[in-house]
Each structure stands twice: as C-alpha cells, then as structure tokens.
Amino acid sequence: MKILITGITGRIGTNVAKHFINLGHDVTGFSWSKDQKIEKMKNFGCKIITGDLENFDDVNKAVKGNEVVFHMGAAFQSGGPFSPNQYFDINVKGTFNILEASLNNNNLKHLVVTSTDGTIPKYPKKRLEYPIAEFDLPQNATDWYGYS
C-alpha cells in the first residue's frame, strides 16, 4: 500500500512509519524543509517530500496517489518559535488542506487525522483513578499548539 505520513519525524509519526515499512508498505513522509530529522527518516527506507502544510499545492502533490494518509504534522512547541498566526496557518489551515487534497485523491482508501494530548490537562490536581477515555476530560489547552 502507498502511505503518506505528515509529521513523520515526530514521536508518533516515526513509529507509525517504522511499523508500515516493516510490513513492506511504500511509505512517504511529508515534512517541513527545516526539519533536522529528515535524513534520519530516509535511513529507515522511506521517501521524504518537503513542503508546507499551509501551501495547498505542496499538500495536494504529497497526497496524490496515496491509498492511506496519516495526518500528524503540525507546528509544535519545540519546532518554533511560532506566532499565533503561524500555529493557525500550519495546524488549522494545514488540516483543511489535507482534507481538501484527500477529496481530490481517487486512490485514497483511508484518512487518519490525529490530535494531541496538548488539548487536555496533563497533570490533574487530583490523581487519576481510572484510565482516560476519549470524552472524560474537558478540553483545556494552555498554549497555541493546544488551541490549534
């Protein structure tokens, strides 16, 4: 299967890529050109396309022809500094670009869009008694990464 992973150099993206490469799939990563981890990913046996999530043409070219898209790419705390507008353009408009490009891709079978734990409180005042389920905690972002 042809798989595209945005955010391939991130903690989760790297592990998703390794998993599908080990299963013999054709994995391509879409990454920001300034990402210093690109070369590391090439060593795992995947192709890397550089571009910007907020640029629809870049996103459309990356999505085209893939059967599966995992969208995990985002401007994040340690990648910046980013302004509030940059967080919005990259994270929100970038996600819309992924959705729009996916609609234009007749080969696409699956689109997986992820979020972040930056939208929930990481250290509640009271200890957690049970594992966290999807709708257990209110959204409680504390920075522009979480907001976007």
Predicted regions mapped to residue ranges:
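Conserved glycine-rich Rossmann-like NAD(P)H-binding loop of the short-chain dehydrogenase/reductase
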Residues: 25-34
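NAD(P)H-binding glycine-rich loop region in Rossmannoid oxidoreductase-like domains
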Residues: 36, 46-90
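Conserved Rossmann-fold NAD(P)-dependent oxidoreductase catalytic core, especially the SDR/UDP-sugar
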Residues: 96-142
